[in-house]
C-alpha cells in the first residue's frame, strides 16, 4: 500500500518524492580525538530555551504537531509532544499519538531482513530472483536477475523508486545493479515479497515477532489496527501546497470490512490475499485508489506507523550491545549494517545496509534517515553509535522539514551535510 500526494502523483506520488535519507555508523569506529569528543559530548535533549520557541517555529512552517524522542546510552530517556494531532478537532499530540513514519519504514525492515540473514533464511549476496520472481517483472530485462539482497539494502538495485502505473507497467531496471545508488522503494517491496515467500508470514507479523515485541515497539504496525485508528495524527499540507488525500488512512478504513468478510485480519495479509480482495476494494473505493494488489498491502518501504518513542526504542535496540539473539542481529551483521557499503558523496556520505552514513570527524559517522508521506508527514532520525545516542522527530505537517532540521541542529549541535543534498 502506498500513500497519496498532490495532483498526478496520486497514491504513488509521495513515494516518488519521498525522502531518501538514511544512515548508521559503525559501532567500532576509531575513537574521536579529545577536542572532537568535547564538541559533541552533550545530551541530545533539546534545551528548555529552544523548546520554548518550538511552537513558533511550528506555526511558521505550518506544522500542527511534533513528537520528539531521545536515546542516551542505548536507552529511551526522554520524549515530548507538541501541538495538535488534528487541526479540526484540536486534539493534542500525546504519548499515544501514532505518526506515519514514512521512509523511516525502510531501516526497520532492513533490520528484520538482516535477522533473516543471520538465521540462514536469506543470504546477502544471493539474488532476489533466486527466492521469488514476481510476475510483474519485465521479461526482457536480464539485469533483474542480478539484483541481490545486499543491493536492495544499500540502494544499488538499479530499480526506480516507484512505477507510475504498476497495474500495466512491468518493473525494469534503470541501471546496472551493484554499480551505484538508485534509491528504490520497488526494491524494498520486492524484498518484502521475498521475505513473505521464504517465511510464510506477512510483513507485519514478521516484524512483530522478530522486532516489535523484542524491542518494546508495542504500538507500531505496518498496517492498521484499533490503536492506530484511535490515535493516528492527521497530516496537514505545507502552507500554500495543494491539499492531498491521505490515502493510507482512507485505504485502510475501506479495507477493514473486506478483511472481516474474508476472515483474515489486515496484519496477516500477504500477496494472494490482496489479489483476492482487489475486485471488492476497487468496487468500494474511488476510481484509481486501488489499481494493483500492492495498493492493498503493508509496504516495507513506507507504511510503518507508530509513536515517536517506539521508533526511539528501535534505535536503542540497534545500538544496545546486550540485546542478544533472538532479539538482535549478530555483531558481525551489525558491523556490516553500519559500515559504508556504497559511496554517496566521497569522503562524507555513504550507504550502509538500510541506513545512510555521514562522517562527522575522522572516521566517526552518525546515522540518519528521513521520510515524507503525502506532502503531510515529515520525519527524521539521527544517531551517534559510539555514544549510543539517538534522536527521532516526527511531524504531521508538510512543512516539517524546516522544523526537524532546527530540532536536530539544536539537539546535536551539528548542521548535517545531508540537509543540503
What spans do the regions from the language model cover?
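N-terminal secretory signal peptides
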Residues: 1-13, 17-24
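Short, well-ordered beta-strand elements
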Residues: 369-370, 378-397
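Short, conserved catalytic-motif segment at the N-terminal edge
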Residues: 40-99, 121, 164-174
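Short, gly/Ser/Thr-rich active-site loops of penicillin-recognizing serine hydrolases
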Residues: 346, 360-364, 394-421
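Short active-site loop at a secondary-structure junction
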Residues: 60-69, 88-151, 175-186, 299-302, ...
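Short, surface-exposed loop or secondary-structure junction motifs
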Residues: 86, 139-372
Amino acid at each position: 500500500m502506498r500513500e497519496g500526494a498532490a495532483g498526478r502523483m496520486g497514491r504513488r506520488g509521495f513515494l516518488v518524492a519521498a525522502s531518501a535519507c538514511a544512515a548508521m555508523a559503525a559501532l567500532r569506529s576509531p575513537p574521536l580525538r579529545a577536542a572532537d569528543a568535547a564538541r559533541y559530548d552533550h545530551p541530545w535533549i533539546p534545551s528548555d530555551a529552544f523548546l520554548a520557541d518550538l511552537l513558533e517555529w511550528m506555526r511558521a512552517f505550518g506544522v500542527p504537531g511534533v513528537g520528539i524522542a531521545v536515546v542516551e546510552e542505548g536507552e529511551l530517556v526522554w520524549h515530548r509532544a507538541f501541538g495538535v494531532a488534528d487541526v479540526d478537532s484540536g486534539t493534542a499530540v500525546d504519548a499515544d499519538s501514532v505518526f506515519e513514519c514514512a521512509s523511516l519504514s525502510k531501516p526497520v525492515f532492513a533490520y528484520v531482513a538482516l535477522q533473516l540473514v543471520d538465521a540462514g533464511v536469506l543470504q546477502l549476496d544471493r539474488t532476489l530472483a533466486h527466492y521469488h520472481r514476481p510476475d510483474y517483472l519485465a521479461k526482457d530485462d536480464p539485469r533483474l536477475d542480478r539484483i541481490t539482497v545486499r543491493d536492495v539494502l544499500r540502494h544499488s538495485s538499479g530499480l526506480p523508486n516507484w512505477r507510475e502505473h504498476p497495474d500495466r507497467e512491468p518493473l525494469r531496471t534503470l541501471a546496472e545493479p551493484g554499480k551505484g545508488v538508485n534509491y528504490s522503494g520497488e526494491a524494498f517491496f520486492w524484498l518484502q515479497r521475498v521475505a513473505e515467500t521464504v517465511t510464510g508470514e506477512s510483513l507485519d507479523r514478521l516484524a512483530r515477532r522478530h522486532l516489535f515485541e523484542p524491542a518494546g515497539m508495542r504500538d507500531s504496525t505496518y498496517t492498521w489496527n484499533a490503536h492506530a485508528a484511535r490515535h493516528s495524527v492527521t497530516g496537514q499540507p505545507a502552507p500554500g501546497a495543494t491539499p492531498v488525500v491521505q490515502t493510507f488512512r482512507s485505504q485502510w478504513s475501506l479495507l477493514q470490512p473486506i478483511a472481516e468478510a474474508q476472515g483474515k485480519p489486515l496484519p496477516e495479509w500477504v500477496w494472494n490475499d490482496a489479489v483476492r480482495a482487489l475486485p471488492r476494494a476497487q468496487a468500494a473505493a474511488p476510481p484509481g485508489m486501488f489499481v494493483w494488489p500492492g495498493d492493498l498491502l503493508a509496504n516495507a518501504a513506507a507504511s510503518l506507523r507508530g509513536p515517536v518513542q517506539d521508533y526511539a526504542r528501535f534505535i536503542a535496540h540497534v545500538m544496545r550491545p546486550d540485546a542478544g539473539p533472538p532479539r538482535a542481529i549478530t555483531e558481525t551483521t551489525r558491523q556490516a549494517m553500519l559500515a559504508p557499503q556504497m559511496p554517496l558523496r566521497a569522503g562524507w556520505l555513504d550507504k550502509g545496509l538500510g541506513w545512510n552514513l555521514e562522517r562527522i570527524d575522522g572516521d566517526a559517522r552518525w546515522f540518519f534517515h528521513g521520510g515524507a508521506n503525502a506532502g503531510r508527514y515529515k520525519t527524521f532520525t539521527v544517531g551517534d553509535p559510539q555514544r549510543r545516542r539517538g534522536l527521532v522527530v516526527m511531524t504531521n505537517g508538510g512543512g516539517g522539514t524546516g522544523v526537524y532540521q532546527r530540532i536536530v541542529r539544536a539537539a546535536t549541535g551539528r548542521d548535517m551535510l545531508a540537509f543540503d543534498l
